[in-house]
Amino acid sequence: MVPFAGYEMPVQYDGMGVLKEHLHTRHSAGLFDVSHMGQALLTGDDPARSLEKIVPGDIAGLQDEQMRYTVLLNDKGGIIDDLMVTRCDEKTLFLVVNAACRDKDFGYIEKKIGGEVKLEPLPTRALMALQGPKAAPALARLIPAVAGMTFMTLTCMQYRGHEIYISRSGYTGEDGFEISVESSFAEDFAKELLENPDVKWAGLGARDSLRLEAGLCLYGHDLDENTTPVEANLKWTIPKRRREEGGFTGAEIVLAQLKD
């Protein structure tokens, strides 16, 4: 176990180890406890347009249950954090941010757009990631509806009397799901998944090696407040409309870099 962002995180699990957990996720299904990530709801008359003032992504173009990767920018175009944004409905967004940046992110959002939206952190929700080629059949044994989900979508549903949010997304380069559940139900839900022999626990070490192998950025290593999306090779996160309209923090610097 190692300390990380105020949590004790497992680097690896007994009987497995980083390499075995990495390979098991690539060939079967790895289960990661990522409850340290920050979860929150952003609500208001038009939270997507409000959020677009501080991110360069197309949030207003999201449909219900669709999610998008984007970055939170400071006034110099530097990356405060990268995050996932899901539109639940026209008045509600679901945010997932990095653990080490959670307080900073939430404070920045409140400072910049707090007069237009309500930010509701969800500290009593846990988060698990089920990743790998056998993740879908493993989760579908418990919740058949997930088999029809498409990449980068999220659905809210009831399971055994608990509200859960399931997205088809991940941080490993594999097919998989990220599952937000009430903390009080997390252990029972994990045990149900682990009854399937294809599912094994995987720790922080394998999570890092898997994302590195997949070419995915890690905040604090590949991204920071002195690095713009252009410098981080994240130009693809800034669509045509946002390039034409601007209007986000640091836009003058970022858009000038895009033209070079």
Which residues make up each language-model segment?
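Generic preference for hydrophobic/aromatic residues in regular secondary structure cores
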Residues: A29-F32, L42, V85, V117-L119, ...
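Conserved, structured C-terminal
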Residues: M1-Y13, L19-E21, C88-D260
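Charged, low-complexity, helix/coiled-coil-prone segments
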Residues: L41-P56, I80-C88, A129-L139, E195
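Acidic, proline/glycine-enriched N-terminal capping motif
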Residues: M1-L72, G78, L204
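Acidic active-site catalytic centers that drive phospho-/nucleotidyl reactions
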Residues: D33, D82, E178
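Well-ordered mid-protein domain cores that form the structural environment of catalytic cofactors
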Residues: D58-K112
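Residue-level marker for the onset of beta-strands and adjacent loop->beta junctions
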Residues: G38, R68, D81-D82, G115, ...
